[in-house]
Amino acid sequence: GCTKFMGSCKTDADCCEHLECYKYKWCGWDGTF
C-alpha cells in the first residue's frame, strides 16, 4: 500500500496519490487535485 498523509516516507513514491515526501520525511500534499 501507500503512505497516507502525515505518514513517514523516504521518497515521493512511498506516498499515496496527491502526496509527496516532505523534507522532514512525512507525506504531505503535493499541490495537485
Curated annotation (Swiss-Prot):
<feature type="disulfide bond">
    <location>
        <begin position="2"/>
        <end position="16"/>
    </location>
</feature>
<keyword id="KW-0738">Voltage-gated sodium channel impairing toxin</keyword>
<dbReference type="GO" id="GO:0090729">
    <property type="term" value="F:toxin activity"/>
</dbReference>
<keyword id="KW-0964">Secreted</keyword>
<feature type="modified residue" description="Phenylalanine amide">
    <location>
        <position position="33"/>
    </location>
</feature>
<keyword id="KW-0528">Neurotoxin</keyword>
<keyword id="KW-0027">Amidation</keyword>
<comment type="similarity">
    <text>Belongs to the neurotoxin 10 (Hwtx-1) family. 47 subfamily.</text>
</comment>
<keyword id="KW-0800">Toxin</keyword>
<feature type="disulfide bond">
    <location>
        <begin position="15"/>
        <end position="27"/>
    </location>
</feature>
<dbReference type="GO" id="GO:0005576">
    <property type="term" value="C:extracellular region"/>
</dbReference>
<dbReference type="GO" id="GO:0008200">
    <property type="term" value="F:ion channel inhibitor activity"/>
</dbReference>
<dbReference type="Pfam" id="PF07740">
    <property type="entry name" value="Toxin_12"/>
</dbReference>
<feature type="disulfide bond">
    <location>
        <begin position="9"/>
        <end position="21"/>
    </location>
</feature>
<keyword id="KW-0872">Ion channel impairing toxin</keyword>
<dbReference type="GO" id="GO:0017080">
    <property type="term" value="F:sodium channel regulator activity"/>
</dbReference>
<dbReference type="InterPro" id="IPR011696">
    <property type="entry name" value="Huwentoxin-1"/>
</dbReference>
<keyword id="KW-0960">Knottin</keyword>
<comment type="function">
    <text>Gating-modifier toxin with very weak activity on Nav1.7/SCN9A and Nav1.8/SCN10A. Shows 22% peak current inhibition (at 10 uM) on Nav1.8/SCN10A sodium channels. Show peak current inhibition and delays fast inactivation on Nav1.7/SCN9A (EC(50)&gt;10 uM).</text>
</comment>
<protein>
    <recommendedName>
        <fullName>Mu/delta-theraphotoxin-Pm2a</fullName>
    </recommendedName>
</protein>
<keyword id="KW-1015">Disulfide bond</keyword>
